[in-house]
Amino acid sequence: MIATLGNLIIPVIFVNYVASETYKLTQRAFDTNFSSTRYDLKNSISRSLYDNPCMGDCVNYTCVVNAFGELEICVTAVDTVRIRHPAAGVLQRDVKYCRGSCVNDTNAPWCIVDTSGSFDLCGPFDAGSKVDSLAYEFLEDRVSFTGRSYGCESGCERTTAPCRVGGTSLPVLCSPIAFVLPPTTPTLKRRTKRNAFVDCFSRNTLLGNNVSSSFIKYLDMFNAEWIDYNVRGHQDDDRIRTIHYGHPYCRR
């Protein structure tokens, strides 16, 4: 399969090359057993509702509790010590910092970068300096900068070209999207839906991966009772929703 960019012909195998290079960088840059002192994030005073210490800040009522990327519900502490780990927020188009441990997931190292729970790939700690994210970017046809697919009629031949649908320009521009894999996905079970979730249907995709997903619109912990729920035993009914912490958009 061939993709075109102006007068250039780009083989789709480039994406596979990018994935391969990302994997190589991941293996070189990170300690898989988290034995390095750069991952020793014990200064946060936040704890999860299950009394586990947070590895970093309590972000959007969620925090990382171990080096495997397990997330648990937590209560935000006003005087939480900010753990800063350099990372570039490619998906957000500006530089952000990790707000928790840099977690080495089975896919790629990632961390939470903002209060909405958005994630990005992270680099090794280097005190006093910023380092680029390990995320690569590549052009994907018919995708706006938000990550939503609008079915652009003209495609994305240039990053400055407007996304056109049926001859009408939408107020967004076609743009590269980051090559980022989603983090470990926790699931939570609650008694009532209230207005906590905005659903994305199972036919949608999240950054190229087929998933059944929901994302948080807002979360009121004090109006709901939460318990752990194993994602491998997930059942999609009115009481159970899969929450994909990490990316605020569902591809449409």
Curated annotation (Swiss-Prot):
Secretion signal span: 1-20
Alphabetical keyword list: Signal
Organism superkingdom: Viruses
Family per record: Belongs to the ascovirus HvAV ORF17 family.
Protein name (record): Uncharacterized protein ORF11
